[in-house]
Amino acid sequence: MNANPKFLSADARVDAAAVAPLPNSRKVYVTGSQPDIRVPMREITQADTPTSFGGEKNPPIYVYDTSGPYTDPDAKIDIRAGLPALRQRWIDARGDTETLSGLTSDYGRERAADPATAELRFPGLHRHPRRAKAGKNVTQMHYARQGIITPEMEYIAIRENQRRAEYLESLKASGPNGAKLAAMMGRQHAGQAFGAAAFGANAPAEITPEFVRDEVARGRAIIPANINHPETEPMIIGRNFLVKINANIGNSAVTSSIGEEVDKMTWAIRWGGDTVMDLSTGKHIHETREWIIRNSPVPIGTVPIYQALEKVNGKAEDLTWEIFRDTLIEQAEQGVDYFTIHAGVRLQYVPLTANRMTGIVSRGGSIMAKWCLAHHKESFLYEHFEEICEIMKAYDVSFSLGDGLRPGSIYDANDEAQLGELKTLGELTQIAWKHDVQVMIEGPGHVPMQLIKENMDLQLDWCKEAPFYTLGPLTTDIAPGYDHITSGIGAAMIGWFGTAMLCYVTPKEHLGLPNKDDVKEGIITYKLAAHAADLAKGHPGAQVRDNALSKARFEFRWQDQFNLGLDPDKAREFHDETLPKDSAKVAHFCSMCGPHFCSMKITQDVREFAAQQGVSENDALKKGMEVKAVEFVKSGSEIYHRQ
């Protein structure tokens, strides 16, 4: 795809690379209590254990799948029509929304009537936007606080469990050693939670719809699901659930197009992006967002102040509450699931950034700081926060309360400006919760490792356990081009301490707009960080995939090693650089150690020797050492021998 209007309107096609199933994988669905609750997962087929290792059956592994219908061969993908409205029946059945006659935002109507944008517009939307009926609240938090378990909550419970119980049962039924195998493959190290992060961290062995409801009701988790984005597959963000990751996409004034951004979205979700933020600041922001939302099975977030700034030609001092309010309604009617709103950037905090090394690095934060200084007034976002809540609950848009004063260098970490804003975000959370509006809190930024836990502990305390959503944090500032790694270190740590969602950083951070390859690199890095955090927390079932891959590695099932990994393509590519032949896929060594120094091959030889001698492995090792000792003495007890 590209930015050519005729091409977009007439010939837009999905990226072929995003629709092919991953190797040895297929889409499966688990049905809930009603037929239209069909929860997708990715089933990874495994080969049987070779007879030389015992000849066991290895049943499929089920993993969390964010790719939506794109990797389902039975689905018809037409990005000009968009995805099926998965949640529409559930929304209709609640009877608390009304269909509007058309768009109600001034800007939305203006764009719809502009002939210059006609060929750019998404052509497949034939339904009108919805809004809560007068006096109604349509948020998932409101339903949860009424004791209601919505279809979205049941869907999430099934999704979070990843068919773990069925997998262990299939192991038990795999043969005479099934029970032992199930115990081995289900084994998991105990996690560790400590300090403030331990408070309220209590994921049960099995996630139930009731548990989902209770966590949402308490504000400890959110379900971002705008009623105008029925295409989204329900997911949850909370520290008692799997750690999630977000991928940022979006055009700029100098690069990218609508088509490239849609491709980035489908690419990001293929590799595991749980949500996507459209941070477009260039041309056609409204149209770009429509294409993305209509084709996205994951929640979409935005920073509305970016588009509001475009409406006043980039002059922050010309922004008004009325322009911003119209932008919120415009985006809510399109279906944006969560808004980053920098309402914590208050006039009193701006001078606190004067002595920083890197000042204010948040785009949204700098916009609001400039407005506050230009007018010497309190931020209109802060002053009108109650009115913003009224808009949010009419569409079920979640808050992502922005950290506009986050540190942009480790020099500035945990300073007075950052922590002052965090306290304000805690106060705003309480206001939003009075309206039953869902909230998560955005966090830094650049923070050295020894200061990361303080961020988490203060957030849990001041923000009353609302989910934390952090950008990294980056743990050092010396590696431009490698900031996916500097931040991945901090992301794994803060995820362990209790952060619910990690915002990815790509290798292009601080350097340029990421392309598709950068998006994938960032996603894989952050999937790794999130998974490491799940393991450290002892999240139920987190170790199942590790155990399966380790078993495949020990049994030299190379294809299973590749396919069980986060990036099968790269694993296979690296292996084949030195051992490309098919015969190498069954070899009992790789190019790292070769056939004579493979530690796993040596272990297998010990086991075979023990079986032949009818002794234990320890006895076999002892006996082998005794034989070698005799040989050493007979050879003259010389450590080194001349050849």
Curated annotation (Swiss-Prot):
Zn(2+) binds at residues 446, 510. Its cofactor is [4Fe-4S] cluster. Its EC number is 4.1.99.17. GO terms for cellular component: cytosol. Keywords: 4Fe-4S, Iron, Iron-sulfur, Lyase, Metal-binding, S-adenosyl-L-methionine, Thiamine biosynthesis, Zinc. It is an enzyme of class 4 (lyase). It catalyses: 5-amino-1-(5-phospho-beta-D-ribosyl)imidazole + S-adenosyl-L-methionine = 4-amino-2-methyl-5-(phosphooxymethyl)pyrimidine + CO + 5'-deoxyadenosine + formate + L-methionine + 3 H(+). [4Fe-4S] cluster binds at residues 590, 593, 598. Catalyzes the synthesis of the hydroxymethylpyrimidine phosphate (HMP-P) moiety of thiamine from aminoimidazole ribotide (AIR) in a radical S-adenosyl-L-methionine (SAM)-dependent reaction. Belongs to the ThiC family. This is Phosphomethylpyrimidine synthase. It comes from Burkholderia mallei (strain ATCC 23344). The lineage of its organism: Bacteria, Pseudomonadati, Pseudomonadota, Betaproteobacteria, Burkholderiales.
